[in-house]
């Protein structure tokens, strides 16, 4: 059986159009089915450093789905193959036991305290 790698495409950066808050992700990650991948999200002290991080999965033609909230919590129905962590101004999404259905866009998101009025 031939295993072809999955390509997990990622948002390169999340920005508010009226703000200068940027979260940086790698452009893509690929791995074979059954393997593990980690997806990084880098920010600053005003966003990731002092706020909770969420992760979203967007399959082609569908709305984004919440995978992780409050850094490492999973909503009901999200398998434990998905995990989140945060350290300093960076966050990571881990996916174990990759499946073909995991091929999607993945987004990190957080609040930026510097945008508070």
From Swiss-Prot:
Gene Ontology cellular component list: extracellular exosome; extracellular region; immunoglobulin complex; plasma membrane
Stretches for region Complementarity-determining-2: 70-72
From the UniProt entry, list the residue stretches annotated as the region Complementarity-determining-3.
109-117
InterPro entries in the record: Ig-like_dom, Ig-like_dom_sf, Ig-like_fold, Ig_sub, Ig_V-set, IgV_Light_Chain
Region: Complementarity-determining-1, residue numbers: 45-52
Q: Name one GO molecular function term.
A: antigen binding
Localisation per UniProt entry: Secreted; Cell membrane
Which residue range or ranges hold the Ig-like domain?
Answer: 20-117
Q: Where is this region: Framework-2?
A: 53-69
Per UniProt, subunit arrangement is: Immunoglobulins are composed of two identical heavy chains and two identical light chains; disulfide-linked.
- Protein purpose: V region of the variable domain of immunoglobulin light chains that participates in the antigen recognition. Immunoglobulins, also known as antibodies, are membrane-bound or secreted glycoproteins produced by B lymphocytes. In the recognition phase of humoral immunity, the membrane-bound immunoglobulins serve as receptors which, upon binding of a specific antigen, trigger the clonal expansion and differentiation of B lymphocytes into immunoglobulins-secreting plasma cells.
S-S bonds:
41-108
Q: Which residues carry this modification: Pyrrolidone carboxylic acid?
A: 20
| GO BP term, example | adaptive immune response
Task: Give the originating organism.
Answer: Homo sapiens (Human)
Q: Where do the record's region annotations for Framework-1 lie?
A: 20-44
Alphabetically sorted, this entry's keywords are: Adaptive immunity, Cell membrane, Disulfide bond, Immunity, Immunoglobulin, Immunoglobulin domain, Membrane, Pyrrolidone carboxylic acid, Secreted, Signal
Protein name per UniProt: Immunoglobulin lambda variable 1-51
